[in-house]
Amino acid sequence: MRGVYLLLLMVGRDLKIRIGSLGVVEFKRGYYVYVGSGQRYLEKRIQRHKKKIKRVKWHIDYLTTNSDVRVIEAAAY
């Protein structure tokens, strides 16, 4: 499958996370939507984003591996 996907994330408390070359980024408690794209295997990409333990490969991984962040829902288009 080729296209875009959306992740609905819940940040459980205010956080400051170092995100690769972006440096420290502040996230307020609440809901966020991440928009990603892929040439194929979107369902596998979504499943990977839902895992807490993984090699940090993309900027979103710095957020999704945090214990105070949950992927609530995901959709691929």
How should each PLM-predicted stretch be described?
Residues 12, 39-77:
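Aromatic/basic micro-patches that form nucleic-acid/chromatin recognition or nuclease catalytic surfaces
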Residues 28-29:
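Non-catalytic terminal regions with compositionally biased, polar/charged low complexity
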Residues 33-38:
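GIY-YIG nuclease signature motif recognition
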